[in-house]
């Protein structure tokens, strides 16, 4: 009934915000043997997962009804990477970081495998974390990877 109410009563006060707790509750950040890569144990791209799980800021922490449905709803979410990747028919580059503390290897592989394009490439940046904090050499390697891929296809000169 709430979505119907929102459709009828549009305007600045139609949406009501709320906080979603526990959005970093992923056992992979505590146990590096689950979906293993080179990431640091007991760590996520936002810090200690036991702390950031209920911190004031986080992954989709503040929501409205519509944004929650888009991000978290099992049936209605538009945030399904592999399903969206099936619609990619143009050349695609997927860059994975081997110490990624935000996207594990299964994420990278599912996206890459789902891409429909016959021209798809997956490249790994050894030892790189999610945001490359304190890793200027890894960031440079990622930029060089993208630059080279674009130049190979004459997308960039």
Name the predicted role of every residue range.
Residues 77, 101-107:
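Conserved alpha/beta-hydrolase "acid-adjacent" motif
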Residues 85-88, 114-117:
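Short, conserved loop/helix-junction motifs that constitute active-site signature segments
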Residues 122-124:
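Conserved beta-strand scaffold positions in the cores of enzyme catalytic domains, especially
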Residues 1-83, 90:
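Alpha/beta-hydrolase
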Residues 88, 94-96, 100:
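Short beta-strand/loop motif that positions the catalytic acidic residue
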Residues 126-157:
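Catalytic active-site module of serine/aspartate enzymes centered on a nucleophile-bearing elbow/loop
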Residues 82, 105-109, 140:
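Short, surface-exposed alpha-helical segments at coil->helix boundaries
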Residues 92, 120:
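Hydrophobic anchor at the start of a short beta-strand
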